[in-house]
C-alpha cells in the first residue's frame, strides 16, 4: 500500500518555509497532497485558485506532490485521498500549542490518521505568510522569503 500524506495550509502566500516542509514530506511519503484550505478567521490576499496555481508552479519539480483544494473538514479530505498521515510544519512552541488542538480534534474524528510534525529548518523559523505580506505591502524585498513566482504575484497585488 502506498504511503499517502496530506500537507494542508492556507499558503497565503506559499513561502520557502512551506516549500521546505512539502519537499521533506515528499521525501518521506510516496504521495503528498498539498491541500489549500480557506481559514475563515483570516482575510486572504490571494484567492484559493491563485494559491493553488502558485503552489503548482513552485512544486512542479516534485513528481509525487499534487496540489488541490478542499472546502470541508481536513480529515474528510484525508480519508477521501486514503491518506494515513497529515504533515504539519512547526516553527516554534507557540505553533505546537495551536496544532495540538487541531490534531486532537482530528484524532477524535478518525484515529487511524496520524499527524506528523516537522520542525522547519532554522533559516525559516521566523517566517510566516503574514510577515511576507507585510513586507511586500510596503515594497520591501521578499526574495529571501518566497520563490520568484510568488514575489511577482505579490508585486502585482500591491502595485495598484
Curated annotation (Swiss-Prot):
Protein name as it appears in the record: Phosphopantetheine adenylyltransferase
Role description: Reversibly transfers an adenylyl group from ATP to 4'-phosphopantetheine, yielding dephospho-CoA (dPCoA) and pyrophosphate.
GO annotations of cellular component type: cytoplasm
Entry similarity comment: Belongs to the bacterial CoaD family.
Amino acids binding ATP: 10-11, 18, 89-91, 99, 124-130
Complex formation: Homohexamer.
Needed cofactors: Mg(2+)
CDD domains in the record: PPAT (cd02163)
GO terms of biological process kind: coenzyme A biosynthetic process
UniProt KW Transmembrane keyword: no
EC top class, as a word: transferase
Encoding gene, per UniProt annotation: coaD
The keyword Nucleotide-binding is assigned to this record: yes
Pfam families per UniProt: CTP_transf_like
Reactions that this protein is recorded to catalyse: (R)-4'-phosphopantetheine + ATP + H(+) = 3'-dephospho-CoA + diphosphate
Residue numbers marked as site, Transition state stabilizer: 18
InterPro entries per UniProt: Cyt_trans-like, PPAT, Rossmann-like_a/b/a_fold
Gene Ontology terms for molecular function: ATP binding; pantetheine-phosphate adenylyltransferase activity
Phylogenetic classification of the source organism: Bacteria, Bacillati, Bacillota, Bacilli, Bacillales
Biological pathway: Cofactor biosynthesis; coenzyme A biosynthesis; CoA from (R)-pantothenate: step 4/5
Alphabetical UniProt keywords: ATP-binding, Coenzyme A biosynthesis, Cytoplasm, Magnesium, Nucleotide-binding, Nucleotidyltransferase, Transferase
Major localization class: cytoplasm
Amino acid at each position: 500500500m502506498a504511503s499517502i500524506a496530506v500537507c494542508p495550509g492556507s499558503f497565503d502566500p506559499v513561502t520557502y518555509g512551506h516549500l521546505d516542509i512539502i519537499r521533506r514530506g515528499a521525501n518521506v511519503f510516496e504521495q503528498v497532497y498539498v491541500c489549500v484550505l480557506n481559514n475563515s478567521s483570516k482575510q486572504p490576499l490571494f484567492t484559493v485558485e491563485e494559491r493553488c496555481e502558485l503552489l503548482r508552479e513552485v512544486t512542479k519539480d516534485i513528481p509525487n506532490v499534487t496540489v488541490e483544494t478542499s472546502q470541508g473538514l481536513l480529515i474528510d479530505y484525508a480519508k477521501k485521498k486514503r491518506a494515513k498521515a497529515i504533515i504539519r510544519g512547526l516553527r516554534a512552541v507557540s505553533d505546537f500549542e495551536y496544532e495540538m488542538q487541531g490534531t486532537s480534534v482530528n484524532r477524535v474524528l478518525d484515529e487511524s490518521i496520524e499527524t506528523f510534525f516537522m520542525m522547519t529548518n532554522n533559516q525559516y523559523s521566523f517566517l510566516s505568510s503574514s510577515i511576507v505580506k507585510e513586507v511586500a505591502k510596503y515594497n520591501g524585498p521578499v526574495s529571501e522569503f518566497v520563490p520568484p513566482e510568488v514575489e511577482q504575484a505579490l508585486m502585482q497585488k500591491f502595485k495598484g
